[in-house]
Amino acid sequence: MAPKSKKQAATQSKSKKSKDLVDERFQAIVLTDSFETRFMPLTAVHPRCLLPLANVPLIEYTLEFLANAGVNEVYLMCSAHADQIQEYIENSKWMGDNSPFSVTTIMSIESRSVGDTMRDLDNRGLIAGDFLLVSGDVVTNMDFSKALQFHKQKKAQDKDHIATMVLNQASPLHRTRSQIDPAAFVLDKETNRCIFYQSIPPVSGKKTCISIDPELLEDFQGELQVRNDLIDCHVDICSPHVPQIFQENFDYQYLRSDFLKGVLTSDLLKKTIYAYISKDSSEYAARVESWSTYDAISQDILARWCYPLVPDSNLVEGNSYSYELNNIYKEDKIILAQSCKIGTSTSIGRNSSVGEGTQIKNSVIGRNCTIGKNVVIENSYIWDNAVIKDNSVLNRSIVAADAQIGNNVTLSPGSVIGFNVIIGDDKVIPHNVKIVETPIVTENEFGDFDDESNSEDENEYEDGNAVPVLAVKDVELVGETGKGFAYESEIESGDEDDEEFVGNGTYSGIIYQMKSLNVSDDSIASVSNKKVKKHSHRRRLSMNSMISDNGGAFESDEGEEEEDFGVEGLATVTRAIENNHDIDTALLELNTLRMSMNVTYHDVRSVTTQALVNKIVDFITTGTLTPQEAATKIFTKWGIMFKRQVFSPEEEVDLLNIVEEKSSVLDKAYNQIVLFLGVKSFYDMEVVEEENILKWWNDGENDEVRTLAAKFITWLQEADEEDSDEDDEDSE
């Protein structure tokens, strides 16, 4: 073979270098939105990733981690408050010449879940190779190079490997471990390949178990380990296949309960996911996903458990914190009265002043704050420009920027005082009360109607999927000179996390509680003024304000273990749901079973309904979804099966009777929700016609389980009357 010319060699060398540069490019995708409402009402005004944590915007900790991880390109996927995030980044050090990576903000305004964001990411074609997927609320000092090396090793060994989860070992009851969404990982003990994932109920003294489909273990040879001692910060190293899988499965909304579980149980994808577990006790990793973890991580930062992520590292340009004994941090230009006492684990920002006789410990004070005389502040977080007047007591509370607390005010544990709120003198704010400057009116997740409110202003929820909020200024709460409205979200009313933050406090002081069903006439908005011909356009009704997310236990009577259609059919549909089979495959298997066992379509409808209800209850009792979210998710995805199981008006009525029967034996905390959303979903999907719904209703008994559905029936009847009136007018 003739020797290569110098020109050919130079060209090939240049090509190789160019390829190496491409291969070395390491991208990071940051999900700036959590798509949750746990930090409402504050996140109605500012994005969670810009809320201050130890006087540093939360996203700075994530970007610092990415800088140490060797990332070259960072894409910030922004939805809620995207303009604020973009403005902050443009004025930050990360846009300077010395930034270790390039930063691009992607306006993913329409995204309403992690799944939507991943599908948007796939559509944009930004991913060049393996990338790091991380939430914008992560605080960690881990050595990422070890995790990346583990990922590359597994990728070389396993051609089906598509992702590596980066997990941190800790006690199951560790305070930074999620108590909202805890989970167990079933791993191959030798390789750390994830075999199964299951959400588990929050620690409550109840026993729980992990149910694994034996089919998942058919090809497995080795030893399994069940890990309930891992902190999952949602830090993942992903291949380009991950966004593509979200694209192919449009119903995937969540990273773990949908994507991870779906991949592991799919008999079509045949992809593998591994877990890198950091066992180094010096490595810290946590997510600020709730008020309790906000408190815990703040205290860990002050106590220097997150070193070098500590206040005196001055992560943000312009910060000037210095460290003193007992974990006290001070910026310059602060004024401390001679008789004030600054206790352990306290940080005070620039230009803040503290009056005579005031005591502060285990707290963070922002910049330009004014703290009066004889004030007591413990385990609380005061943000920039806040004013706390004389003789006030704050315990485990949040006071947002520009808020004012009057003289002789007591903030009980769990209090959240929103931006610009004013609390008058001599007031006591009860446990867990949240106060906002103005009422919040938002579009609910069904997207159709809003409840009436005294304000015309609208603010977006943290995740864009909000629930209407009752808000009325209460002089008893904020005082004559005060400014603010009690805030209580229907979603949050069932959230136990606030109680965690305050030490099992209660909601006794809330002005408006929404823990029980709210079935007021005002809950239903009027139908559009446009003429609607009967059956030509299906009406849409939002009933979100009528539903709370109280849950309860479900006990099922399994009956005899016989090989009959009841058992086989139920197992078939359940397996289809768990493994996320396509609808046609599930129906084919079920129909084959029906013919082989010579049963009626009534039996088919019965086992299908039972399987759907069982999955809804599973979501609820494991704390994975609220009753409303669970019923909506299952009926919307799998209710379409009934279109090929009902063929006459009588069978439509029979289906509704079955759903009512299955719902009636559920826990009373959510059985009405399951029945109502089942009926409404079947109507929306045109599985059952309006007249057959009314026939079912009129023929049945007025049981308690029908209470919530009654409003839907009333709406149907009134809308039908309007149609009749319009038809009469047209005929005239």
UniProtKB/Swiss-Prot annotation:
Keywords noted in UniProt: Cytoplasm, Initiation factor, Protein biosynthesis
Gene Ontology molecular-function annotations: guanyl-nucleotide exchange factor activity; translation initiation factor activity; translation initiation factor binding
Residue ranges occupied by any W2 domain in the UniProt entry: 559-726
Any single Gene Ontology cellular-component annotation: eukaryotic translation initiation factor 2B complex
PROSITE patterns on file: W2
Pfam families, per the entry: LbH_EIF2B, NTP_transferase, W2
Localization of this protein: Cytoplasm, Cytosol
Superkingdom: Eukaryota
GO annotation terms (biological process): cytoplasmic translational initiation; translational initiation
Family named by the database record: Belongs to the eIF-2B gamma/epsilon subunits family.
Subunit organization: Component of the translation initiation factor 2B (eIF2B) complex which is a heterodecamer of two sets of five different subunits: alpha, beta, gamma, delta and epsilon. Subunits alpha, beta and delta comprise a regulatory subcomplex and subunits epsilon and gamma comprise a catalytic subcomplex. Within the complex, the hexameric regulatory complex resides at the center, with the two heterodimeric catalytic subcomplexes bound on opposite sides.
Described function: Acts as a component of the translation initiation factor 2B (eIF2B) complex, which catalyzes the exchange of GDP for GTP on the eukaryotic initiation factor 2 (eIF2) complex gamma subunit. Its guanine nucleotide exchange factor activity is repressed when bound to eIF2 complex phosphorylated on the alpha subunit, thereby limiting the amount of methionyl-initiator methionine tRNA available to the ribosome and consequently global translation is repressed.
Protein name: Translation initiation factor eIF2B subunit epsilon
Organism: Candida albicans (strain SC5314 / ATCC MYA-2876)
Organism placement in taxonomy: Eukaryota, Fungi, Dikarya, Ascomycota, Saccharomycotina
Gene that this sequence comes from: GCD6
